[in-house]
Design a protein with these regions (language model features):
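A short, conserved alpha-helix within the catalytic core of class I
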Residues: 180-193
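Short, low-complexity intrinsically disordered segments enriched in A/P/G/S/L with frequent Arg
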Residues: 3-4, 9-16
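Conserved beta-strand signature within the Rossmann-like core of class I S-adenosyl-L-methionine
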Residues: 196-202
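Rossmann-like AdoMet
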Residues: 13-105, 109-153, 159, 166-167
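Hydrophobic adenine-recognition pocket in adenosine-nucleotide-binding enzymes
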Residues: 177
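A conserved beta-strand element that flanks and buttresses the S-adenosyl-L-methionine
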Residues: 172-173
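Hydrophobic/aromatic-lined pockets within catalytic cores
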Residues: 44, 182, 198
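Short amphipathic alpha-helices and their capping/turn segments at secondary-structure boundaries
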Residues: 91-94, 190-196
């Protein structure tokens, strides 16, 4: 099964190779788990028939000063994770097709390259949200792009949603974050999202 889309000319023009020196990695706890998911996506990109085909992830791991052997991950594990990510990408594209002028909020973005894989149009506002140390690392290895903003905060902190205008349909992506939330925190987060945005999807 190959769910990887063909990269458009605009996406091909984007390169992460502007980083001249490797970036050190100092992460712990839940934030460190994002290294495994990034590496699995990079391994998938090397397959003859990739599921995700995330060449941005492959470029990103080359920018990090990290011994990937520490993860003890083999390529056979990659499909277990990339199938889920590819399905989320499909849902995002469907939402963007239905709402060309919209907002996307990606909770617990980690080092995921979704905004680059999707390459949303000029009328889409995209927010990637994660712990401050994660956002600091993203800023070092990924380029900026129009209508793209990073928010450095734990998802459970109240108030950060106020930074996001509520004037258009909004999609909340929460791939891989629910296991780190208590039931009360998860319910409270969803309620704040519902109260803030009148039209959207989770």
């Amino acid at each position: 099964m190959n769910l990887a889309p063909t990269r458009r000319a605009g996406a091909l023009a984007l390169s992460l190779t502007y980083v001249s020196e490797k970036v050190s990695v100092n992460l712990s706890g839940p934030a460190k788990t994002m290294l495994s998911t990034l590496y699995l996506k990079a391994l998938d990109a090397d397959f003859d028939r990739p599921i995700l085909g995330d060449l941005f992830a492959k470029e990103a791991i080359d920018k990090l000063d990290f011994d990937w052997r520490e993860l003890e991950i083999t390529p056979k594990w990659a499909p277990l994770f990339t199938v889920r990510t590819a399905q989320y990408d499909i849902w995002v594209r469907e939402f963007l097709a239905a709402h060309p002028e919209c907002t996307v909020v990606h909770l617990g973005c980690g080092l995921d390259c979704r905004v680059f894989r999707i390459d949303p149009g000029a009328d889409v506002r995209w927010y990637d949200v994660d712990f401050p140390q994660v956002i600091a690392l993203r800023e070092k290895i990924y380029p900026n792009r129009p209508n793209y903003q990073l928010i450095a905060t734990p998802a459970t902190e109240p108030g950060w949603l106020d930074q996001i205008p509520a004037d258009r349909p909004t999609l909340l992506i929460a791939e891989g974050i629910s296991m780190y939330l208590t039931e009360d925190d998860g319910i409270a987060l969803l309620q704040r999202f519902i109260d803030r945005f009148g039209i959207g999807e989770v």
